[in-house]
Every structure is written in structure tokens, then in C-alpha cells.
UniProtKB/Swiss-Prot annotation:
This is 3-octaprenyl-4-hydroxybenzoate carboxy-lyase. Catalyzes the decarboxylation of 3-octaprenyl-4-hydroxy benzoate to 2-octaprenylphenol, an intermediate step in ubiquinone biosynthesis. It comes from Cupriavidus metallidurans (strain ATCC 43123 / DSM 2839 / NBRC 102507 / CH34). HAMAP family: UbiD. Pathway: Cofactor biosynthesis; ubiquinone biosynthesis. Prenylated FMN binds at residues 180-182, 194-196, 199-200. It is a peripheral membrane protein. Its cofactor is prenylated FMN; Mn(2+). Binds 1 prenylated FMN per subunit. Keywords: Cell membrane, Decarboxylase, Flavoprotein, FMN, Lyase, Manganese, Membrane, Metal-binding, Ubiquinone biosynthesis. GO terms for cellular component: cytosol; plasma membrane. The keyword Lyase applies.
Amino acid sequence: MQYKDLRDFMSQLEQRGELKRVAAPVSPNLEMTEICDRLLRANGPAVLFEQPRRDNGDIYKVPVLANLFGTTQRVAQGMGASSLEDLRDIGRVLSVLKEPEPPRGLREAGKLFTLAKSVWDMAPKRVSSPACQEIVWEGNDVDLARLPIQTCWPGDAAPLITWGLVVTKGPHKKRQNLGIYRQQVISRNQVIMRWLAHRGGALDFREHALANPGKPFPIAVALGADPATILGAVTPVPDTLSEYQFAGLLRGSRTALASCITPTLSELSVPASAEIILEGHIQPDPNHPSGYQHALEGPYGDHTGYYNEQDWFPVFTIDRITMRRDPIYHSTYTGKPPDEPAVLGVALNEVFVPLLQKQFPEITDFYLPPEGCSYRMALVRMKKQYAGHAKRVMFGVWSFLRQFMYTKFIVVVDDDIDVRDWKEVIWAITTRVDPTRDTVMVDNTPIDYLDFASPVSGLGSKMGIDATDKWPGETTREWGTPITMAPEIKARVDQMWGSLFEEGPGK
């Protein structure tokens, strides 16, 4: 599915019946969450709330787009694919770009050249009069209360920006980083930027603070970017490829970029077709140990299904807001699976498989069950080749992609087990695992800060479960042989099946 920008994508969805408009007034304070939660659980359409209602009954001038990625099919379409299965092709492209191999012949050389040319052809282009700057708010006009920002759950601390595409650049880096981090509104022009220590934005900020102490850190936030750019920011793109270039590959057209208006943000480029852009800085604060303004964030209902603990994060002060005419505010909520992050996880799972198989050819399938909060549990199917092989694969998965450093549980099974069928996985665990021999415990590893089950915030343990058949060296006992029916008997019963239960004459 090809499209120009978010509006074009929405138009195509609406033509297919995958986007519905809600004309009735609906509040972004809790009501939208409940509506979208019901829609998502029913595999329902994306929704455009045309009249977001304030608490006093007034109507916001900006409509709200929600549940955009509420089905894996729409995620696939957003990534330029026609189906979930086609996402594996994207994974194969990324695996080649991540670790290209020397061609083994002219045909492979030609394919590699074609791929390289297609990547080169998708270099972003500059736009001098971008749609995202048709309207500009400055000074006292900068007021986040003018936007219909959702409050998702009853215990949430404040309205929360959820789909903001955060653009940063480290002082020693040539390329920008795109990341999606939630942002708590704390005043008319300030939000708390909740990025974890390992994320690209936090790393850029840390480098800036070391290289330029006491100087404001520039940030731009794009709201309502096109789906390819949004999804490119959560995909494991090789460091040699910019997310904007990758978005062009997905979309089938070069990403149009614009420079920020604020002079101190001149090095940051934003999607020219985005609906809304926030421009500003993290300001210095000599009274804080980091040297920069921080505030206590949360609590918020999160993808774990719980409210998270409060913690200190940088404050982003917004100097200027630019937008398209008649802008659309793109929003979501997170909660106990299923939610949009869980749906994204199922879709991106198909991108991960070829990347893993490039590094570990013995892996035949890989699955992140949505019940595992997107990434906390991984199920791996493999062709085992030697004793201890399953444990090697466990450690390989934990260390291969940054996304898997927070995976708490890995279960490895043989190639005869369908990792997408819980019944088979549980059968393998209960019949092929000895708890002492076949579990691997690793202490003091990185853990999601939202995981309150860990003894220390951000640091906890991992468990690997080897649910494969055991080879000599792993057991001294004779291993069991699975029960299977003889093929000729199954074929014979297939032939007679239709007549077995027919009622005869007189019955």
C-alpha cells in the first residue's frame, strides 16, 4: 500500500471501511480510551473523533485520530506491505543492509546493486515551504491545552502525549535519532520527556550534556507523521541507514523533510507532512545534579496493565508549535494487552524473524506472544544440532538486538513444536524440561524500568528454558519417542471417514 502522508493513508483506509468518523462529542479524558479499547479488542477500524469535548463542554478545534495501528493488517499497510506475511520481506531487506555478504555470483551481485540503488534513491528530500509550518504558534499562543491530549486511565497524573516522534541529534553524530517516548504535560509549554537510559534520545542528551554542559539541548517532536516514518522509528534499522531513508523504502517515495523554524534547532529535520511539530529545548538547571531541568513523572497506566512508579526525567520546554491547516492530533493509549503496542509487537515480530535467521540459521521461527507485553517473553523454534545448542541460542537472542535486552523469559523448542500455539509450547515444557538442568538464570541484567517485579529499578534477572529434546551429554536416560499414528492408517481412515457415521436404512 503506497501513500503520500498520514491524510492520504487515512483516506485509503476510509475507502476500505477501515476508518470510521465519530461526529458525536467524545472526551479525550478517559472516554476515548474506553472506546478504542473496545474497538481494538474487536479488530475494529481506526477512528477519527471529529468533536473532541472539553470538560466544560466546549469542542476542541482539532480532531483526534486513534486506533490507527489497532490491527496487524493496518500495521502492515503502514509499512507498505499488503499483508502480515509480507513483513518478512522487509526483515530480509534489513538483514542484508545490516550485514551484507559478498555476492556469490553475478546474479547476487545484481540483486545487491539493485537494493543499494533503491536505498540510495530514497535519500530524503528538502522542502522549503512545508505543510507542517502553515500555521505557527509563538509566545503566549504556545499552549498545549489547545490540543485534545488524552488522559488515558483514572489514575494517570496528567494528559499524556503518546505518539510523539522525538527528533534528536548527538554532538558527535552525523545522523538524527527518531524515537517515540511518552510525554507528560505539566504546563502550557512543558512536558516531561520519559526516555529510558538506553534509548537513542537519552544517549544523544547524555552526550550533549558532556560535550556542551550548561547549553540547552534542542528537540523537535512530530505529531501525526506518516505511518512509515512512525513505524520506522520502532524498527531495528541498521545504524548506517537513517529512519527517514527507511521510511522512504517502506512508503515507496522519498521522505520530504523540513528544517525547524527555531534557529537553535537548525540541525534538526522534521517530516514536512507531519500534522503538528513541537520545537524547543531541555533547559539547563544548575540546581539539579544532571545540570538540566527534571521533574517527577507519573504514575501512568502502562502496557504492563499496571500503573508504573514515579521517576525523574528531563523537562522539555516548547518554544514554538507549527502545524498544518486543520491539523489532526494522532493519539493512542497503553494498557494490559491487547493494546496498540501489543499489536505492533505481533507485526514487527515478522520483521525480526529474518534478522534473527541471518545470524542464527538454525532458528526456524520466533514469536513474541502479545500476552507477554510485547517483548518480555520470546518463544524460539530451532533445528537443534548438538548438546547445549538451545542455551547458545538463548544468549544469542538476548544480545543480538537492542529490543531484546529487556526480554525476561526465553523458551526454546524443537522444530516439531509450533511456537504460536500455546498448547504445544506448554506440552514441550512439561515433557522435555527438568527444572534444574534445563533452566538458565542470569542475574543483574538490564530490565525495563516499568517492570516493578525486578528487585532493583532497571536491573533484574532473566530465565531461559530449554524445552528441546535432550541429546547425549545432556541426559544419560533413553529419551522418549513421540506417539504418532502410521501414515497408511491415517490415509485409510480419511477415505472411510465420510461413511462412518451415516445413518443406515430403517434407523
